[in-house]
Amino acid sequence: MAAYAQFGYAGYPTANQLTTANTDSQSGHGGGSPLSGTNEASLSPSGGSTATGLTAGPLSPGAVSQSSHHAGHKGLSTSPAEDVVGGDVPVGLSSAAQDLPSRGSCCENGRPIITDPVSGQTVCSCQYDPARLAIGGYSRMALPSGGVGVGVYGGPYPSNEQNPYPSIGVDNSAFYAPLSNPYGIKDTSPSTEMSAWTSASLQSTTGYYSYDPTLAAYGYGPNYDLAARRKNATRESTATLKAWLSEHKKNPYPTKGEKIMLAIITKMTLTQVSTWFANARRRLKKENKMTWEPKNKTEDDDDGMMSDDEKEKDAGDGGKLSTEAFDPGNQLIKSELGKAEKEVDSSGDQKLDLDREPHNLVAMRGLAPYATPPGAHPMHAAYSSYAQSHNTHTHPHPQQMQHHQQQQQQQQNQQQLQHHQMDQPYYHPGGYGQEESGEFAAQKNPLSRDCGIPVPASKPKIWSVADTAACKTPPPTAAYLGQNFYPPSSADQQLPHQPLQQHQQQQLQQLQQQQQHHHHPHHHHPHHSMELGSPLSMMSSYAGGSPYSRIPTAYTEAMGMHLPSSSSSSSSTGKLPPTHIHPAPQRVGFPEIQPDTPPQTPPTMKLNSSGGSSSSSGSSHSSSMHSVTPVTVASMVNILYSNTDSGYGHGHSHGHGHGHGHGLGHGHGLGHGHGHMGVTSNAYLTEGGRSGS
């Protein structure tokens, strides 16, 4: 109670006092009540009223006595007129106090009830009663008969103690107020009554500061974070940096002290300032406004200090390649473009050197530039890229003259050519490097038509494996086809003046010479010897062949590698009418293997899968009939490409190991294949055994 008396709360009873005072309070008269101090009316915050039933109810400094609403507890509130004895109540207060309504709890005002952490009592958190505040009083404000002290708002405290709440009514320094305990009374009076009051939330004057007052000495705003600093440079901040840069164009390298000064002025970090100057120097250099000598090779020693957000910013506005390094026309960085041009030049040199050394893999593999004219077969376009017109080359190569001796079939060939000119691919015989413009014109078309892969116009002729694999129908390699593509009509269709590729002839001249005397007398194939000289036999000698060599797939179909099956008699004689020479084309190789991609062949090139074995056996027989020739390595290798019993049509496909297949089938085979090769009546690129060669 000392605390209550000290702070003017003498009117609030303790629990034990209430138990003894129940009888007196029920009488309705407060005279001599132990609840009062020197004067009930003056010292009781309730204006002289007495309260009962507060042993377990919520305590509140409200003007009206409160009791809990718990069942079993009854709170009796009496107006001041009932409790006041005589004229103890001042006149000014009596009229106002009589107007106060009887209340059960201050929490009816909507204020929450809190639980005292020490005593466990439920305490209403409202410190002020609205009715009392209406008459300008604080709940602890003393009435005229009370002791005089320092009031909260200039009013008197009923205590001799000078304001036990230092934070109320006293403008303490903002620096130390948060460090002081405005509820220090708990230390002096640890009674349960006071512990309940100390839990009540009294706002201190420092609560109006939204930031730690200890930061006030630095003059920063309440929302200023010392750690974050400025995250993004603004125009205002960079204006200072730009001004400094414009004044130091001769030497745009601020010293450490200048950077620190600028960082303080702009409220930026030192790293941001350094990065800004590094980017500014780079920007001026790109704009050819560089008016200083670079310090070192990297031109900027501050680039390494660039922060992540500045790097992103620089990449957004200044990170684009300038036209000095990037050629928008060719979509290439100039350094890469230069490499591509060098490759083009070197490829041009290769074309000039083809007569001496056939290094170009496009021709050796039968790889065509992937662009094809809309109306032409892909392989036709592939080879027509090396020469513009397939009917205009009338200048046979000297080496080819010896292979075009039989020309009496020319009329038949021309007729067949008209029928099958566009049905199946044929090798365009205009030599390999005769028209560079034709080749590049075809290559300038991107792969997008067949593969969906754009290729720069400067792409060299030597295509990579990746390009081949990416294409829907990669061109079959020369190991499978050879490069002598002829219209699918018949071997006799070949015009005698169509030249053979020079480098093929040079590479395999020895094989050709060995086989020139093996040509079958009945066949007038214009390129029989050359067929063994074709890249297939050459490539087969590599023992690897091409990846597609054993796969009779859409690739072989697209190449026109279906040989019309014919009886051994027709193949041996080759004198039947063209219609007999071209029965239904059949599939070559192993029919059960199919490619992953659907065949992209014209409807006219669809294969007839029937009769493969019979035709192959027939061709094998015919090949055995033709001649027995010395077995060459190329023929041996071609065993790889033909079935053991068929040697399908290798006979036809220009000696691409055709004969070899035959030899396998019958055991005589290899030599026969050569005979075939020279003599195949059909010039199809398809595998010949079947074509009845």
UniProtKB/Swiss-Prot annotation:
InterPro entries: HD (IPR001356), Homeobox_CS (IPR017970), Homeodomain-like_sf (IPR009057), Iroquois_homeo (IPR003893), KN_HD (IPR008422). It is found in: Nucleus. GO terms for cellular component: nucleus. Keywords: Activator, Developmental protein, DNA-binding, Homeobox, Nucleus, Transcription, Transcription regulation. Residues 516-527, 651-675 have a biased composition (Basic residues). It comes from the Eukaryota. Residues 226-288 bind DNA. One of its GO terms (biological process) is regulation of transcription by RNA polymerase II. Residues 288-298, 308-317 have a biased composition (Basic and acidic residues). 'Caupolican' is named after the Araucanian American-Indian tribe, also called mohawks, who shaved all but a medial stripe of hairs on the head. Belongs to the TALE/IRO homeobox family. Controls proneural and vein forming genes. Positive transcriptional controller of ac-sc (achaete-scute). May act as an activator that interacts with the transcriptional complex assembled on the ac and sc promoters and participates in transcription initiation. PANTHER family: HOMEOBOX PROTEIN ARAUCAN-RELATED, IROQUOIS-CLASS HOMEODOMAIN PROTEIN IRX. This is Homeobox protein caupolican. It comes from Drosophila melanogaster. The lineage of its organism: Eukaryota, Metazoa, Ecdysozoa, Arthropoda, Hexapoda.
